[in-house]
Amino acid sequence: MDRIIEKLESGWWIVSHEQKLWLPYGELPHGLAANFDLVGQRALRIGEWQGEPVWLVLQHRRHDMGSVRQVIDQDAGLFQLAGRGVQLAEFYRSHKFCGYCGHPMHPSKTEWAMLCSHCRERYYPQIAPCIIVAIRREDSILLAQHVRHRNGVHTVLAGFVEVGETLEQAVAREVMEESGIKVKNLRYVTSQPWPFPQSLMTAFMAEYDSGEIAIDPKELLEANWYHYDDLPLLPPPGTVARRLIEDTVAMCRAEYD
């Protein structure tokens, strides 16, 4: 599936190494390969954006290596492709040898997979399903400040789905573990690939059922009910968390304004 980049090759360039992304001038490289010293490198076509190919190059650059979070405020489709590139780059880097027999592996020519020529085992990129849920109580929404995000941002609750667990069960468990409350009338909203490191966010809305807020201090700094017209600092646009919050605010305004 990969090929040697030629001088006149053009498109969007996802240059990635160890979950980092090359972002010269803070943006994804776009244009001729020769302009970015990519001629002769191996590249894998991973998609198309605005009629042009999107290429993945597994390479480390000495300067301007940053996080894919830096392009989150760009178009959702381009952010999704950048996330795909970072995740694939990490998959290929971490699956050079077979976990069963220890022999070297090679990329499949027909799909995103790594193959072992010795024991015939086949590996695919791992995807970790997560739930994220906006909880409404009359004209208020539950927002929390997470321990791992000490930047003042308040967001909705989220967590990984455990083995043998449905998405609905994961919502109920995560909400209870992190905030001590029960929810009802769960409704699926949307999903978003989230490359931190390889998650798939499944987004829900729910209504408060019962209980008092009792946070898990290992997960949250604080959590509280916020009136829809008096919200704290929120996640950036383009995130599924922000969409859930805005959708909840819209529902509150339709009912209470």
Curated annotation (Swiss-Prot):
Q: Which Pfam families does this UniProt record tie to the protein?
A: NUDIX, Zn_ribbon_NUD
Cofactor(s) recorded for this entry are: Mg(2+); Mn(2+); Zn(2+)
Q: Where along the chain is substrate bound?
A: R69, E111, Y124, Q192, P193, W194, P195, F196, P197, Q198, S199, A241
Q: Which GO MF terms are attached to this record?
A: magnesium ion binding; manganese ion binding; NAD+ diphosphatase activity; NADH pyrophosphatase activity; RNA NAD-cap (NMN-forming) hydrolase activity; zinc ion binding
Q: What's the superkingdom here?
A: Bacteria
Catalyses: a 5'-end NAD(+)-phospho-ribonucleoside in mRNA + H2O = a 5'-end phospho-adenosine-phospho-ribonucleoside in mRNA + beta-nicotinamide D-ribonucleotide + 2 H(+); NAD(+) + H2O = beta-nicotinamide D-ribonucleotide + AMP + 2 H(+); NADH + H2O = reduced beta-nicotinamide D-ribonucleotide + AMP + 2 H(+)
Q: Where does a divalent metal cation 1 bind?
A: A158, E178, E219
Annotated ranges, domain Nudix hydrolase: 125-248
Listed binding positions for a divalent metal cation 2 are E174
A single GO BP term for this record reads:
NADP catabolic process
Detail which positions bind Zn(2+): C98, C101, C116, C119
Q: Which UniProt keywords apply?
A: Hydrolase, Magnesium, Manganese, Metal-binding, NAD, Zinc
Asked whether the keyword Hydrolase is assigned, the reply is yes
Is NAD among this UniProt entry's keywords?
yes
The EC number on file is 3.6.1.-, 3.6.1.22
Motif interval(s): Nudix box: 159-180
Free-text comment on the cofactor: Divalent metal cations. Mg(2+) or Mn(2+). Binds 1 zinc ion per subunit.
What is the official name of this protein in its record? NAD-capped RNA hydrolase NudC
